[in-house]
Amino acid sequence: MKFFVDLNSDIGEGYGAYKLGMDEEIMKCVTSVNCACGWHAGDPLIMDKTIKIAKENNVAVGAHPGYPDLLGFGRRKMVVTPDEARAYMLYQLGALNAFAKANETKLQHMKLHGAFYNMAAVEKDLADAVLDGIEQFDKDIIVMTLSGSYMAKEGKRRGLKVAEEVFADRGYNPDGTLVNRNLPGAFVKEPDEAIARVIKMIKTKKVTAVNGEEIDIAADSICVHGDNPKAIEFVDRIRKSLIADGIEVKSLYEFIK
């Protein structure tokens, strides 16, 4: 049986004179990137530059829309109506798409950021609104969302292209959601453990939740981070370990049809 997976990372998350992450370095290790669109991070110049660098590295690009929350980096919950959620996503998707077009490339996917991502994964009204927006904008854009979530299931039911995402360094609740960042078990800190978990998720479609329960999971894409040199080394180790274990690493557009 053949196994393959995408490696994705969030990039373009600086703002003005402030730089965040090691974008050029992480692009050497991943197959897809999620570019901030100006609301939780990023700005027009960073968005343009990020698209250029991704194209030079032959890495697929996706939009990474967040809530309008620069001070909270898009990680704080907001009360928004479904129509606001749809409009927020479309506004940012359209902005990044303009830079993609200007650089003669196309957006591969859309992945929400932070609180927007977590809330839309489980809140039906928000998920439906975001999916409505994708249908209005471009049905060929892949929707990357939390594995096993309502958004993933509903997107597939609608016939949209959906990539189910897992996290190399995050803990899982028994219901398949991510453990809150402020709670024990939120992060997998040992590289060897994280790599073993990732391989298990891909090959067995199972992961061990924080309570010890084995839960179902699908892994089309693995989210990794490139915040510092150690993180880059970790991602490089993940990629090499996947390949050594017979798992092909490639962009979503190559296998999500």
UniProtKB/Swiss-Prot annotation:
- Per the record, the domain of life is Bacteria
Q: Which GO terms describe its biological process?
A: carbohydrate metabolic process
Please list the coiled coil stretches: none
ATP-binding among the record's keywords? yes
Task: Say yes or no: keyword Transferase present.
Answer: no
> InterPro entries from the xrefs?
Glyco_hydro/deAcase_b/a-brl, LamB/YcsF/PxpA-like
Q: Which PANTHER family match?
A: 5-OXOPROLINASE SUBUNIT A, UNCHARACTERIZED PROTEIN YBGL-RELATED
Give the protein's recorded name: 5-oxoprolinase subunit A
Can you name the source organism? Fusobacterium nucleatum subsp. nucleatum (strain ATCC 25586 / DSM 15643 / BCRC 10681 / CIP 101130 / JCM 8532 / KCTC 2640 / LMG 13131 / VPI 4355)
By which gene is this protein encoded? Answer: pxpA
